[in-house]
Amino acid sequence: MRYAFLKHMKEHEAHAAQRGLGLRTYVVGSEGEETRLEAERIGHHYIEVDNKPLGAKFNAAVRMALDDGVDYVLIMGSDTFFMPSLWDQYRDLINAGIKYVGIRDLYMWDWNNDDARYWEGYGGDRFGEPIGCGRLIHKSLIKGGLYDSHRNSSLDASASRRLPKATVISCRQDLLVSCKEELSITPITRFPDAERVDHTMFLPLIP
């Protein structure tokens, strides 16, 4: 999955450029030389950071991008794939001056058994809160660390506490999909009420 994601993001650099957006991919790995070589051969920026605590690892990725002079940081996990059309939504909101964009919903696909589902997003007290991946955040909103550095879980909530309310969009048409396994931090089995969908619609997304 890792190499497929690296190729996927390289393709998205071209898709973003077609829409007038400059995209650079920053990879923060903890697997050593093999991952570094994979990332750098494709043309991505790479830094090695311990996998735990995850909060410190995520903060290192954000800091690497900010130190390189980017205007926005896009948070995307290495298990996530999406259609190029998502850039149309991001471009329009960037051009409108929006500083924080989030995605409210998500597709999930367990590669082990082809269980695929569509989740509409948080309800109750968390209604309207964006999911973790796909958050597009302007540099002016990031003061110090974006995440609690000591955390290995609840990272999305720790970032939300530091940020204003997001302008939230849907990925239903853009097929943002998180490829899950039972060993994932948030396995697909935690969403028993999510709508079941046909996994084959995600196949064209995987390089």
What are these regions (language model features)?
Residues 33-40:
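Acidic helix N-cap motif at the loop->helix transition within catalytic regions
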Residues 1-18:
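Short, well-formed alpha-helical segments that are part of the catalytic scaffolds
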Residues 4, 19-21, 55, 98, ...:
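Catalytic phosphate/metal-binding cores of nucleic-acid and nucleotide-processing enzymes, i.e., regions
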Residues 17-33, 47-51:
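Short beta-strand/loop segment that forms part of the nucleotide-sugar
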Residues 149-207:
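C-terminal catalytic/acceptor-binding lobe
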Residues 81-154:
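Conserved catalytic core of nucleotide-sugar-dependent glycosyltransferases
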Residues 51-65:
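Glycine-rich, basic loop-to-helix element that forms the pyrophosphate-binding segment
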Residues 70-81:
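Short beta-strand-to-loop acidic/aromatic patch adjacent to the donor-nucleotide binding site
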